[in-house]
């Protein structure tokens, strides 16, 4: 049938009838199923019969229009009904909402009212409690007042026969106040060592007699005890006390005896039972210890030269002639063993103080064994000290009170302080120049100082500062003081050398170039001292040849010899005019003074080293490179300079560079757990190389700090000045050259430190020096390899550098070490082709930026890219360079995330198909490797996530060694798992030394790279095949394993060899000898 019927018997075109109202349909006649009544066979050509009943009972024509109108009316009625119901619901909701709001507001008012009532009740209770307390206090005061009045009344009304020796409450309070003031005065006198300059004191001293009960013992007068002038009494002054009749006179008599003994003017009339030590104990004030320059006899303004009689009549005992006025450190300690209030220990971490050696209050029982051990070590120290000529330390160390009463925690400190004291007679003095001090603060005792300089300046008493650390145990505190002494000695020695050089430049300036003062870096003190020690250790006359002739021909002739010239003849001697005689004599005097100064500095160095070794701490200034005198030095301006012996040539092997100064670059928070890039990285690598013996097989070279000019070959001037200077030398720079204040550049990190971002921490004191040192170490190593002094090299440096851009530090990096080294190779050695391979798991965006348009530097990076979703987001395969550098920037960017992570098979395949073919076609002169090891297994996902083995990097290094004649330098970049980076560094150094590497596992050799790696390699080869022809034949081998690729290469090599052995050319016919005639054929 052409039309399908619906289950209800209606055709498809009549379906709208179903929209009728069901009530209306009920009135319609029901349909009759007549399907069974139809004949079974219907002719095909017959018209289909319509069996609907509505055709049989057809309605009028106007019925559909009416039906439609009724339907619309019903719809409108329904809508109106729904609208009414909706309004009713909304009204009900608003009514309930208002009702609930009123209830809530009422509850709030009720709650607030209750709270206010509670607060009012509480306040009322507090007021009542306060009133009760006030009333109770008033009642107590009234009772106390009544009680006192009753007592006073009883005292007034007492009978004469009763005893009255009991002192009243007022008298007891006065006595207690007097005793406390006296104790405070005694303690204050022990600290100040200075006689009061109050005018009331001088007036009172002359008015009061020795029998006055109101005057305290005058062995030492305190500034806090003021003697009032008659008629001038204040509320704070102490009134003289009336002695009662019942007070015993024994105490008064003892005081009188003491005062009479102290006021005797002549020491011959002193009592036999008053020894000298007693006076010293009772009166710690000494002539040299006092800071006052006037005697009490004539007031504060008179000089300190009054006689003993004047002192006696003023109540101050003079110095005893049998005791030296200039007491030593140990003698002052012995004199103060009975002091009532010992001085507090001052342990400043920055400057050693002589008060460190003062004894403690007394030894404890727990330190008896330690004191015995210290007593046993004293004779050994005395024997070692006996080697010093002219020393006075033996009686100090053998003093029994010092051993007996010295505190256990401070006795080693005192021994160390005494050991460091060197007599002035040891250093040769130059007339008119004075001696150079050995330490920043003198530790020499008063009995060893010349009388002309024994007077001390006035000072305030020392006490513990709020920032000073608490006293530690003996060993830790001694070690701290020794470190501080060593650092101060180095600082002082450096300052002396700079002052001497400045003085020499002033005396004999060179007209061709101005004098230049070197930059001063606090962290370079020990480094510069090592450099200058070579200059100090050489004999002065050996460094200045021709000086003996100058001594012989002082004012007559000066022989001029050529500098570093063996072929040219020396100029003939010329006579010096009489007018030039005086300058020659001045130069001769200056040379003699300079000779003595340098000898004195050498002597001080040796004495210091010997004293530190005597204290049990060996001090060595390390090795140094031989220094030649610069042409701008004062000596070279006037004297001939001898040709220095050439330095020892390093072994032609692998070079290593490392410096402990780079360890100081750390966050100020002091914790390395929250900072992956920490000092333990390079320290662990250096220890591993030493433990395995690889360090001994290599040549360790000395690094240096890169100059600001070298850094500016890659970075901007503002960036270099901001991150390449410390606070000391930054003040000398022009503020206009800096981009802005440091506060706008650095941020506060969550750990409490400071940094550029959450990764790149900044230490204001040490970060600039460490970053410059890392660049300088890489530059030194690269130049030694490029010039052929070393075979290859590995730089153990930090902070890394391949993320540092021209003006932006990021990713732990401040200066791009490898990029600076490459730029300097181009500028100074004219190296035409440089290959930089970066196998850090992060893309080296800074290195790419530096050489993006340079065709002489081929930059190849193997890194995790993940379509730009991995830090730093750069390094896409289509970043090929710009301008003339197109094609010389190759990014082997791995995509696909960590499903699965890349491993040895993927990196070996990338080297085989992309890196080595392009590098071989480029044919570099030097190979530099940004050797980051964060792709080694063991790193978390944010820092790498790949699963390369450490030995794989050894094989990658071995492949790169086949380029550039083996001139390759690896510089440490990333890598934060200590075990991983130590294993990888060991493998790379072993490969550089040419050692046999551990074989790769068979599984790695047979493993094919995963699909993500194959797609990444094919994309790179597709992009760069237009620039490098070698990639056209390696595209098909990207998905093969290492064994399959080697087998295929061997087969191709055999095929090429076989084809080369076959030749289709015809060999030329051999010529017959001319003398051999051709045989004629016989005639037929």
UniProtKB/Swiss-Prot annotation:
E.C. numbers: 3.5.1.98
Documented effect of changing residue 244 to K: In NEDCHF; decreased interaction with YWHAB
Post-translational modification: Phosphorylated by CaMK4 at Ser-246, Ser-467 and Ser-632. Phosphorylation at other residues by CaMK2D is required for the interaction with 14-3-3. Phosphorylation at Ser-350, within the PxLPxI/L motif, impairs the binding of ANKRA2 but generates a high-affinity docking site for 14-3-3.
Effect seen on changing residue 727 to R: In a breast cancer sample; somatic mutation
Biased composition (Polar residues): 629-641
First-listed, main subcellular location of the protein, grouped into a coarse class: nucleus
Stored CDD domains: ClassIIa_HDAC4_Gln-rich-N (cd10162), HDAC4 (cd10006)
Keyword annotations: Chromatin regulator, Coiled coil, Cytoplasm, Disease variant, Epilepsy, Hydrolase, Intellectual disability, Isopeptide bond, Metal-binding, Nucleus, Phosphoprotein, Repressor, Transcription, Transcription regulation, Ubl conjugation, Zinc
Coiled-coil region list: 67-177
Annotated compartments: Nucleus; Cytoplasm
Catalysis performed (reactions): N(6)-acetyl-L-lysyl-[histone] + H2O = L-lysyl-[histone] + acetate
Outcome after substituting residue 349 to A: May affect interaction with ANKRA2
Annotated Pfam families: HDAC4_Gln, Hist_deacetyl
Keyword Nucleus included in the entry's annotation: yes
GO cellular component entries: chromatin; cytoplasm; cytosol; histone deacetylase complex; nuclear speck; nucleoplasm; nucleus; transcription repressor complex
Covalent link location (Glycyl lysine isopeptide (Lys-Gly) (interchain with G-Cter in SUMO)): 559
Gene Ontology BP, a term: negative regulation of transcription by competitive promoter binding
Oligomer status and interactors: Homodimer. Homodimerization via its N-terminal domain. Interacts with MEF2A. Interacts with MEF2C and MEF2D. Interacts with AHRR. Interacts with NR2C1. Interacts with HDAC7. Interacts with a 14-3-3 chaperone proteins in a phosphorylation dependent manner. Interacts with 14-3-3 protein YWHAB. Interacts with BTBD14B. Interacts with KDM5B. Interacts with MYOCD. Interacts with MORC2. Interacts (via PxLPxI/L motif) with ANKRA2 (via ankyrin repeats). Interacts with CUL7 (as part of the 3M complex); negatively regulated by ANKRA2. Interacts with EP300 in the presence of TFAP2C.
Known role: Responsible for the deacetylation of lysine residues on the N-terminal part of the core histones (H2A, H2B, H3 and H4). Histone deacetylation gives a tag for epigenetic repression and plays an important role in transcriptional regulation, cell cycle progression and developmental events. Histone deacetylases act via the formation of large multiprotein complexes. Involved in muscle maturation via its interaction with the myocyte enhancer factors such as MEF2A, MEF2C and MEF2D. Involved in the MTA1-mediated epigenetic regulation of ESR1 expression in breast cancer.
Disorder cited: HDAC4 point mutations and chromosomal microdeletions encompassing this gene have been found in patients with brachydactyly and intellectual disability syndrome. However, HDAC4 haploinsufficiency is not fully penetrant and multiple genes may contribute to manifestation of the full phenotypic spectrum. Neurodevelopmental disorder with central hypotonia and dysmorphic facies: An autosomal dominant disease characterized by global developmental delay, impaired intellectual development, seizures, distinctive facial features, scoliosis, delayed closure of the anterior fontanel, and non-specific brain abnormalities.
Protein name, per record: Histone deacetylase 4
